[in-house]
């Protein structure tokens, strides 16, 4: 009784959920049984219980038939349960009649019972007990269409030789019975029901579950009929094949490769897969949006190849262009944008024998990559590989700075001196001490620096000598002044001495400067070093003015001063100045304005390069306006144009070191730029440079100044003239000397030398105008008072 009560409780709990479902499934089973392929007519008892209310006395016959079919009975308690399965029992009886050996009756909720045909019926494991308080009726259900139910599957341990016909007839049909094997005679026990699996279908395996999902998602007669009763169950590979696909792609003029995509992928998605496939060549340099795909139609009638848009469906496009399937020759072409970054030089492979040395190289890394093999090749390789390594010396100047090593020089230099003659002298390595790092780097560098050394190196040293003695000349990145001694020291350790010769050159230069520095020098040497030029110093600071005046005295040149730009222009108009040291920041008129005014006056009066004979542009420009031209001639006319042989040289003086100030000064017309404080050495060089230039431009005028200076020494009246007309040679009769006249006794010369110069040169000078004398007279007094 306990077993019966337990089953009754289970039936009561499930009756409420499956009340309507039982009748619906019973009707579905009845309809499917009537359309099965064996042509059996539906039994008459199936229709009446489903459409009419059935009373208790009339349920005896279906109950008895259920007991005879092996459903099992336990007295009157099983009658209520049989109401729920009356339609199912009738269907099962039809299936039992068709079976030849035995029957395995399976209920829709996963419960089954098996009986043997030749033995006595066994007790059923599937009896369910309805509760007493639930009304035992079979409700009448009217269905417009069969309810779709997922196809079920038998347990894994049972064979399935054939599927029921109901599966192929309609998707709502459910296989109700399965036959056991012909040799089975033993009674098999049914699987115990599980409450979690009682929803719509029984427990199925993973492979059958995939089939069930496939049938649900893709309903259709073709798919249902494809599952033939005799074929094996489909596997998960079929569903995977429906989701993925492979297409052929390739780079231009390259081999094709397969790329796996999905059925619903767009061209934009395919580009991501392509970058994964070409991870090195494309993935490191390009992004997916940069890649484009071109498709070439198979038919010649179609339009030419075109670029696929990122929004196109890839699979549909492939199917449209290639109906029979894409072949390897019809692969999509991958296009990427051309590189805009400069590529490395094609003449820079890891080894130098791939390069040609005709043009200079600027690559850094190739020499470094070939440093290791080059020392070995200098002793083992033939001459031909060395001849191919011509560009090595051109790259060495850079490799020395990068790594401090010169390993590649010896091997190419030992065999290819001839072809390198016109190129290697350009790259001198005297500025680096790197040759001491590796052996074999210097023999070729020593011979390559000077073309004359290379033929001697070929004649005196062989391949074996170069390889054997390559370690000795390591410290010689030579600049030998004499090629022959350098060649002799090539095989010895003495070559470092030519490197030390560079400081000796500096000492020689110092020796040359030494004669210039002493104040008392012979007149002949003075005439050759500092020409007798006239300098105008424009400076508003009295301290700077005195410093520059002292410099001029040491150089023994004539000079005058001006305190502002307007005064400088006025003094320049007097003529006779070769150099103007112009301060930029000045009162009244700054240095830039004064410079522009001087240049304008030079252009208007046609001085030097601005004369009509040398340049027509200024005159033409001024001739366009006759009135302004006449006014300029009246206001800006110079007194004696013979005093202006060439444009004056103007050097800007400023305490600012800004590049903009330099550009502004040069644009205003200055010839040079000098930053304060002034260095005497620099000033000395500039005075020589500009003075010699003026002497070359106006040699006749320079001779006039020299002759006039000689006359001034013998004429006392000339001592009253402006300092601009005073000779470099001092006048010994002058008791009070000033820096403007530069006539101190320390700067004087012997009378014998002065008389000799007067005898050699004849005076061609012209007496200066009195205006200059008036302007120059007050200046010595001011400077003298400042000096005192």
Curated annotation (Swiss-Prot):
Pfam families: Response_reg. InterPro entries: CheY-like_superfamily (IPR011006), Sig_transdc_resp-reg_receiver (IPR001789). Residues 534-691 form the Response regulatory domain. The modification 4-aspartylphosphate is found at residue 583. The keyword S-adenosyl-L-methionine does not apply. Keywords: Cytoplasm, Phosphoprotein, Two-component regulatory system. Two-domain response regulator protein in the two-component signal transduction system of the HOG1 pathway. Controls high-osmolarity adaptation and fungicide sensitivity via its regulation of the phosphorylation of HOG1. This is Response regulator SSK1. It comes from Cochliobolus heterostrophus (strain C5 / ATCC 48332 / race O) (Southern corn leaf blight fungus).
